[in-house]
């Protein structure tokens, strides 16, 4: 075996994709010292997106002060590439779930305002091309916070300006974009997301994702009604129907909420990364692709990061083996095309222990070593 590509997503809440790949690389080097190993950390639009792209493109990292989901000041960073022309922004850095303790999470009250501030900062620096990775958000405001930070105003039936939070979507009566940052007319946005959910409904932003952001059952209904109402207001103002657009429900409606007001397109996060970094060229002469994420299940094949890796492997006729902290629906994953799907846990453990970073890295290293030892026996 001469060439192995390591294309791991993060094991969310435990270890990032870079550290996972390093652990796998160590095991391969010990078993196959002459093998070429290419680390290709990936992400699907959520956490790790900026890191993966910026590292591969040798981006300049810049920092700025913005507001978190509860409008508290924080410092964030993002990447600039292409001689200052493109900004790579991770939504989660300004309004991600990890920024809020689980006891304080409430998508009725959170906002994407800080993401808009990041965009405004990049516009001031001269950027006109944007990749925004959306996902792992603590918000359900359909992007009105981001748009407000860029100059938009959202008014109620009495012409009062609304605070851009999830609970106020139902109250939006008018949208005023007359003061939108003029540099946006010269800009293009690629919105990279990791899901295909519609804007509202039983499979939409509120019902599927708001509970993990802290919403109770009544709040889920309120948020969904707000998204329905806001979609209708958008249609009246822009003649664009985002109601059933695949991916519109990503990141609390951020996926669909930006398209009517920006020169933007919504793309699968993993496709953005694989295309930008020319993944197919990397794997074309490989003997094996090793990939993985924290949980492998039926959703793995629904536009998520590993699905993109698998499709690239199939196109280049390279086998793909996936490792997971937890594995469900093994047979279904095999039918999707994975050569093998393996759990990394050596024995039953608590969730807390399974998520411990050092334990995860040890398990990745041990499992990869066993995979390589098996392959060695059949490739002598």
Identify the meaning behind each predicted range.
Residues 2-134, 138-380:
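N-terminal loops that bind phosphate or other acidic moieties
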